[in-house]
């Protein structure tokens, strides 16, 4: 596009003294289409006059001649960066069609819209149609045709000369001359259609060689085809005669000679075929192999053709007396084949394909007949293989064994230390084609007897969904929604819910199973079993034992129990004893204890006390309940019970005597001697979960339970203060001589149980009066010395510190004070008290928050008050009365008379002496 503008016309003068320039498309700021300039300066800063024949350039440019708008190195027209029209802000308009520029003009005082790229196909002008030029990766011109060559070779790779082959056949029959055969061999053959490769779509070639397909070539092709058909007929007739046993010796010799001639003359026969112009196909589509059958003929077609391509058709050599006419059997009949050479291509009708398929089938049958039968060769059986392997010498190390050269050794990576023989897949697969064995009936029977197929597998086998067993669904089924299929399956499942026999699991009814079990029992041989003879000393439940005699008391009504039965009944009743059933069960125990009134030695009473004592020591948590049981027995026991060995003590006093004597005996022995000890007599540290561990745990539990039981007996005044003084003195004696942890734990348990009550107890002797508080002061001094010594474990040390704080700080107010057995009513009462306490705390917190908000409301007024001296007013804060109340309580308790023992009437002065 050239610039056709001439020199600018002279500028007319305006009345106001300013020059008015004519409008140009590419001026600095002149308006287009002769529109008036509406700027404030009346276009004062318009374009400069031409200087040195260079338009739109100031005279003395600061940066030389190439300042802003000089486009010496640019294209065509001069355009400026501030032109708001005509492709604004761009220096060229090459991206737009010139015919489109006039339509892009905008009136004055309007900014041009943002311009976008418009494809050439969308340009609304009469421009040449846009055509996409395909990429041509082939450097050769597309008009040059590709020549395709086909090489026909035998099975051994030698080329087959069809030319000489036809000449020999024609010479033998005298039908045509050799010259005619040469011309026919150059023409197209029926193989050209199969051997023609499929050209890709981007390499479509125009048909430029249509002149070669004329009437002469067509006639030669027909003659060659006719020759092939004749050879096929002869070949078929010879095969039929051979099959029927009618072939003669002369024909055999003739076929043998023909076969030898064919083998000796096998030069290359190259058939050039013209490229076929076909419809474009996808380049990724693979070319199919034309011929591949048991006749041995195969055509190799490459996937991509870039130049002159040579294709080889390989024919297997005949294996029997038949000649090399196997090639001719690809065509069956001349009348069913039509060849069309129009537009340089060759077309074979559907009848040709059917003919070739039938001929290939016939050839397959022929080859099957001529090949030696493999069934005639005797193959070894699997049983023989197993027998041979059983006799063979085993290999000690398969990885070190010397294998033959053609055998690949097993891979060492499959070696396992726990398994002797481990082979990899590569080692085993190399014998796939080398070892062939046939299954013999004996092996089949032995293996099939070990295979069990559940009946439900065969019943649930899916039906044949297609002709070949595959899942051939119709297009409508393929597009079915997954939800619909799931609904159908759920409906089927719901229908099967009523009948479990059609479910996936093998279901048999109970009746069927019972019948099957009965049949199995009937079939099983019955063994004679000797009748069971009961032993004389067998165990019999007591409830089923029938007493031959029943002992009755002298009154004739009360039944007397023997020693074993008393122990059994006591254990049963003590196991059922709870605070809810305390009255009823304790009454039954008291009835058993009253049986001693018919005895002289109090044997039954001793058994009752012994069982209660063992139960109390073994269950320390329930010690308080068993102490209450002892108190009831002492209080309600029949006073007529006597013991001839303890004269002067009867009834309740006898019970206290038995109880105190049993507690004193066990307390003196302690529970350290029951721990497992070594050869030197020192206690051992048993292993966890061992027998010694459980023995030590039981001894510790019973020892601490004894101390706890003695403490609760003292709290119930069944034991006097003198007895408790003796217990503490014995413990303090042990504390002075390097105490053991067992002794310290006994002291801690006794203080937790009786500390509060013993603090205010006192014992009067003829010499002086002993107070419990004084004894406890001496005891805690010893404990403090042990704590400071640091020779004990941290567990015992912290327990001693807790007991010391319990007396000095908490004043025996322990949270564990009420820990013990409780009735259901007591548990409900405690829960109700706890709930009320929480509610009261919540209400108090709300009240305090309300008062705090009110106090904050008047805090500003209090801040403004004048500060006074702290000692100028008396504080209204009341002191804590906790210490005063505590001291007053101590004074009252000291002033009170000593508690009267509830069993003082029973023990009198003799109780302390015990």
UniProtKB/Swiss-Prot annotation:
GO terms for cellular component: cytoplasmic stress granule; eukaryotic translation initiation factor 4F complex; P-body; ribosome. Residues 567-810 form the MIF4G domain. It comes from the Eukaryota. Its main location: cytoplasm. Keywords: Cytoplasm, Initiation factor, Phosphoprotein, Protein biosynthesis, RNA-binding, Translation regulation. The modification Phosphothreonine is found at residues 196, 301. It is found in: Cytoplasm. The modification Phosphoserine is found at residues 74, 503, 913. Residues 26-44, 298-325, 339-348, 868-886 have a biased composition (Polar residues). Pfam families: eIF_4G1, MIF4G. GO terms for molecular function: ATPase activator activity; mRNA binding; translation initiation factor activity; translation initiation factor binding. Residues 1-12 have a biased composition (Pro residues). Coiled coil: none annotated. SMART domains: MIF4G (SM00543). Residues 201-315 are annotated as: Interaction with PAB1. GO terms for biological process: cellular response to glucose starvation; positive regulation of formation of translation preinitiation complex; regulation of translational initiation; stress granule assembly; translational initiation. The keyword Phosphoprotein applies. Residues 1-84, 128-205, 240-351, 457-535, 833-914 are annotated as: Disordered. Present with 3390 molecules/cell in log phase SD medium. Component of the eIF4F complex, which composition varies with external and internal environmental conditions. It is composed of at least eIF4A (TIF1/TIF2), eIF4E (TIF45) and eIF4G (TIF4631 or TIF4632). Interacts with PAT1 in a RNA-dependent manner. Component of the eIF4F complex, which interacts with the mRNA cap structure and serves as an initial point of assembly for the translation apparatus. Stimulates translation by interaction with polyadenylate-binding protein PAB1, bringing the 5'- and 3'-ends of the mRNA in proximity. The formation of this circular mRNP structure appears to be critical for the synergistic effects of the cap and the poly(A) tail in facilitating translation initiation, recycling of ribosomes, and mRNA stability. TIF4632 is probably essential when TIF4631 is missing. Belongs to the eukaryotic initiation factor 4G family. This is Eukaryotic initiation factor 4F subunit p130. It comes from Saccharomyces cerevisiae (strain ATCC 204508 / S288c). The gene is TIF4632.
């Amino acid at each position: 596009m050239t610039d056709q503008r001439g020199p600018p016309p002279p500028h007319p003068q305006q009345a106001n003294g300013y020059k008015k320039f004519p409008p140009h498309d590419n001026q600095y700021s002149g308006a287009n289409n002769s529109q008036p300039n509406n700027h404030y300066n009346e276009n004062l800063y318009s374009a400069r006059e031409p200087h040195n024949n260079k338009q739109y350039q100031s005279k003395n440019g600061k940066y030389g001649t190439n300042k802003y708008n000089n486009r010496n190195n640019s294209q065509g027209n001069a355009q400026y960066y501030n032109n708001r029209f005509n492709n604004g802000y761009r220096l060229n308009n090459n991206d737009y069609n010139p015919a489109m520029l006039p339509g892009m003009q905008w009136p004055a005082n309007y900014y041009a819209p943002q311009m976008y790229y418009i494809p050439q196909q969308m340009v609304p002008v009469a421009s040449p149609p846009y055509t996409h030029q395909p990429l041509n990766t082939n450097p050769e011109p597309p008009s040059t045709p590709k020549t395709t060559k086909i090489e026909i070779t035998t099975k051994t790779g030698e080329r087959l000369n069809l030319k000489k082959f036809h000449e020999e056949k024609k010479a033998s029959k005298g039908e045509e001359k050799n010259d005619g055969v040469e011309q026919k061999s150059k023409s197209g053959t029926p193989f050209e259609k199969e051997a023609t490769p499929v050209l890709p779509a981007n390499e479509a070639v125009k048909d430029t060689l249509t002149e070669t397909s004329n009437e002469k070539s067509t006639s030669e092709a027909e003659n060659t085809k006719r020759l092939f058909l004749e050879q096929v007929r002869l070949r078929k007739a010879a095969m039929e005669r051979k099959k029927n046993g009618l072939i003669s010796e002369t024909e055999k010799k003739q076929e043998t000679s023909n076969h030898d001639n064919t083998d000796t003359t096998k030069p290359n026969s190259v058939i050039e075929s013209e490229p076929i112009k076909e419809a474009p196909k996808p380049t990724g589509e693979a070319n199919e192999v034309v011929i591949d059958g048991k006749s041995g003929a195969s055509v190799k077609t490459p996937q991509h053709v870039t130049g002159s391509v040579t294709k080889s058709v390989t024919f297997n050599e005949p294996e029997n007396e038949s000649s090399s006419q196997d090639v001719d059997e690809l065509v069956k009949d001349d009348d069913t084949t039509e060849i069309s050479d129009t537009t340089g291509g060759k077309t074979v009708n559907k009848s040709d394909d059917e003919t070739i398929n039938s001929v290939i089938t016939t050839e397959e049958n022929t080859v099957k007949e001529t090949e030696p039968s493999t069934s005639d060769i005797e193959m070894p059986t699997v049983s023989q293989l197993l027998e041979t392997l059983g006799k063979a010498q085993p290999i000690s190390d398969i990885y070190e064994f010397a294998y033959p050269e053609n055998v690949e050794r097993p891979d060492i990576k499959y070696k396992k230390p726990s398994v002797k023989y481990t082979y990899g897949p590569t080692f085993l697969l190399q014998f796939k084609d080398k070892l062939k064995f046939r299954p013999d009936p004996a092996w089949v029977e032995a293996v099939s007897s070990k295979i069990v197929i559940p009946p439900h597998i065969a019943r649930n086998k899916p039906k044949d969904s297609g002709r070949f067993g595959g899942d051939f669904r119709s297009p409508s089924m393929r597009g079915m929604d997954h939800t619909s299929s799931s609904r159908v399956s759920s409906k089927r499942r719901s229908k099967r819910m009523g009948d479990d026999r059609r479910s996936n699991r093998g279901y048999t009814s109970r009746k069927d199973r019972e019948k099957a079990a009965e049949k199995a029992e009937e079939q099983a041989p019955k063994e004679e079993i000797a009748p069971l003879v009961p032993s004389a000393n067998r165990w019999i439940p007591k409830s089923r034992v029938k007493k031959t005699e029943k002992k009755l008391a002298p009154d004739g009504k009360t039944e007397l129990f023997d020693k074993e039965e008393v122990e059994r009944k006591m254990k049963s009743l003590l196991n059922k004893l709870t605070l809810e059933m305390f009255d009823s069960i304790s009454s039954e125990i008291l009835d058993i204890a009253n049986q001693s009134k018919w005895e002289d030695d109090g044997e039954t009473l001793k058994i009752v006390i012994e069982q209660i004592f063992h139960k109390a020591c073994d269950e320390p948590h329930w010690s308080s309940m068993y102490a209450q049981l002892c108190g009831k027995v002492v209080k309600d026991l029949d006073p007529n019970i006597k013991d001839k060995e303890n004269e002067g003590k009867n009834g309740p006093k006898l019970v206290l005597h038995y109880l105190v004597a049993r507690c004193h005996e066990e307390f003196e022995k302690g529970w350290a001697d029951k721990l497992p000890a070594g050869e030197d007599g020192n206690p051992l540290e048993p292993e966890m979960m061992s027998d010694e561990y459980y023995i030590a745990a039981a001894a510790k539990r019973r020892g601490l339970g004894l101390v706890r039981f003695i403490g609760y007996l003292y709290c119930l005044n069944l034991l006097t203060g003198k007895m408790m003084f003796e217990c503490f003195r014995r413990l303090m004696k042990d504390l002075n001589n390097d105490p053991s942890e067992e002794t310290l734990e006994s002291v801690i348990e006794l203080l937790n149980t009786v500390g509060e009550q013993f603090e205010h107890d006192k014992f009067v002797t003829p010499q002086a009066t002993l107070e419990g508080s004084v004894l406890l002061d001496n005891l805690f001094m010893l404990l403090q010395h042990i704590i400071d010594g640091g020779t004990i474990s941290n567990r015992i040390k912290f327990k001693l510190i807790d007991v010391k704080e319990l007396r000095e700080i908490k004043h025996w107010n322990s949270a564990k004070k009420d820990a013990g057995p409780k009735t259901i009513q007591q548990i409900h009462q405690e829960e109700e008290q706890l709930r009320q306490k929480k509610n009261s705390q919540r209400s108090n917190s709300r009240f305090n928050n309300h008062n705090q908000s009110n106090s904050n409301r008047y805090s500003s007024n209090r801040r403004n008050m004048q500060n006074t001296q702290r000692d100028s007013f008396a504080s209204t804060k009341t002191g804590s009365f906790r210490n005063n109340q505590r001291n007053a309580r101590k004074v009252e308790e000291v002033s009170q008379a000593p508690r009267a023992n509830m069993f003082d009437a029973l023990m009198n002065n003799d109780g302390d002496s015990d």
